């Protein structure tokens, strides 16, 4: 963002949380049931939640925003590390 900003190019990132898409099929059914409880809003987001964040950043409303990560997770990050499907082995502390 700092390198491209002088050229009028904005660089941002969207970081979605638990979003109800076909990607959920990668998780076991018992894990997907827990996704509704992993954030303060007590629901999963949907593709429109993410799309509206992208529109916000790309529209005139985001014209002075660069170098940012827009987290669209219903507040999940506020709760710390959440593993609704269980902690993967490579993240476990022994």
What residue spans do the PLM features occupy?
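C-terminal helical subdomain
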Residues: 13, 29, 34-65, 74
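Alpha-helical segment proximal to the catalytic Tyr-Lys
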Residues: 2-6, 63
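Short, flexible catalytic-loop segment of classical short-chain dehydrogenase/reductase
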Residues: 6, 15-26, 72
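Rossmann-like NAD(H)/NADP(H) cofactor-binding core
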Residues: 7, 12, 68
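Conserved mid-core segment of classical short-chain dehydrogenase/reductases
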Residues: 23-29, 83-88
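Short C-terminal tail/terminal secondary-structure segment
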Residues: 66-94
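Methionine-biased hydrophobic packing positions in alpha-helices, especially
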Residues: 23, 41, 76-78
């Amino acid at each position: 963002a700092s390198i491209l900003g002088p050229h009028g190019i904005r660089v941002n990132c969207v970081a979605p949380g638990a979003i109800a898409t076909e990607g959920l099929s990668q998780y076991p059914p018992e894990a997907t049931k827990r996704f509704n409880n992993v954030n303060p809003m007590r629901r999963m987001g949907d593709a429109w939640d993410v799309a509206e964040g992208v529109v916000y950043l790309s529209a005139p409303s985001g014209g002075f925003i660069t170098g940012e990560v827009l987290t669209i997770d219903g507040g999940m990050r506020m709760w710390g590390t959440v593993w609704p499907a269980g902690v993967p082995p490579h993240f476990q502390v022994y």
